[in-house]
Every structure is written in structure tokens, then in C-alpha cells.
Curated annotation (Swiss-Prot):
Protein name: Malignant T-cell-amplified sequence 1
Domain free text: The PUA RNA-binding domain is critical for cap binding, but not sufficient for translation enhancer function.
Residues in the signal sequence: none
Entry keyword Hydrolase: no
UniProt keyword Transcription present: yes
Length: 181
């Protein structure tokens, strides 16, 4: 999604949101990530301006004080940015890939089933279409945000094909954007 993303070329406009819209977004975030509820006022303080940065390909990035927090495509589900995930790692369930998969994930490749079932990997129970943080064997922080394409049980049974779709990874265009004023 953000492999060839560039702030100067892909951002079309930025609008400040009304309080009623912010409330709706906060409720949507709580529905999607129940764990985040007690931290939401810390992540999105009431007095700080909340803006939506609109980009090409119908991508919207939610910002507070210029800090990129969440993004979505076409009114779909929100995904946390990796910078937010590094501050609050508990907001998403984790899956762990082995060391051999790291370079492929960091180049934007989807996570294949064998990379989740090999000895260095850890596959935790999760349903299909769940948003997950991808951790790496021996690393502390998440290296990508992904969406489960199969349930964890199916990944273990089939052990072929794409297990998790890579949505946003370290060093992609969104990671390089850092802040938006």
C-alpha cells in the first residue's frame, strides 16, 4: 500500500475534523481495538486538533498534532501506524516470523505460511481478517502491520500460500513521512 508512497506526490489535502466526527472515529477505534479504550485520551487528547490527511488511492491518515496515528483505505477499517504501535505494542495481537523472513517483510512482501510455522516463528490463535502486528524472531519492535488472510489453524494445516497480507512495514513511504504539519 505504501511501497511507492511519497508525501509530496501522494498527499492531496488535509482537513481538520469536527468534534462530532472525532467522537465517531474514537468509537470506531474502540470497536475495532477494544484494548485501546483506556489509552485513547492519551493517544488523541481532547484539546489537540485532529486532522485527516487525504492521499491518492483513497487513503486517509488520521493525525493529531502532526503525528500520524492511524490510516485506512476507502472507509475501511483503521490500521495503526508502526510509530504508534511501537509506543503502544499491546493494541494489536502479535504474530512472529522467523529470521529468514525479515528481509522479505521489510521489502514489502506478504508473509507466507512457512515463515509463520518454522521453528523460529510463533503463531498465536487469530481469526482470518484480523489486524495483527508482525514481530520478528529476536527483535523487540514490530516490523509490519498486516491482515490475516487465513486463520492461525488454517495456516498450520495448509502451510502454503499467503498467511498474512503486509499493509505497512518499516521503511515504507508512510514510515518515512514521520509527521504532517
Amino acid at each position: 500500500m505504501f511501497k511507492k508512497f511519497d508525501e509530496k506526490e501522494n498527499v492531496s489535502n488535509c482537513i481538520q475534523l469536527k468534534t462530532s466526527v472525532i467522537k465517531g472515529i474514537k468509537n470506531q477505534l474502540i470497536d475495532q481495538f477494544p484494548v485501546i479504550e483506556q489509552w485513547l485520551n492519551q493517544i488523541m487528547p481532547k484539546k489537540d486538533p485532529v486532522k485527516i490527511v487525504r492521499c491518492h488511492e483513497h487513503i486517509e491518515i488520521l493525525t493529531v498534532n502532526g503525528e500520524l496515528l492511524f490510516f485506512r483505505q476507502r472507509e475501511g477499517p483503521f490500521y495503526p501506524t508502526l510509530r504508534l504501535l511501537h509506543k503502544y505494542p499491546f493494541i494489536l495481537p502479535h504474530q512472529q516470523v522467523d529470521k529468514g523472513a525479515i528481509k522479505f517483510v521489510l521489502s514489502g512482501a506478504n508473509i507466507m505460511c512457512p515463515g509463520l510455522t518454522s521453528p523460529g516463528a510463533k503463531l498465536y490463535p487469530a481469526a482470518a481478517d484480523t489486524v495483527v502486528a508482525i514481530m520478528a524472531e529476536g527483535k523487540q519492535h514490530a516490523l509490519c502491520v498486516g491482515v490475516m488472510k487465513m486463520s492461525a489453524d488454517d495456516i498450520e494445516k495448509v502451510n502454503k500460500g499467503i498467511g498474512i497480507e503486509n499493509i505497512h512495514y518499516l521503511n515504507d513511504g508512510l514510515w518515512h513521512m514521520k509527521t504532517y504539519k
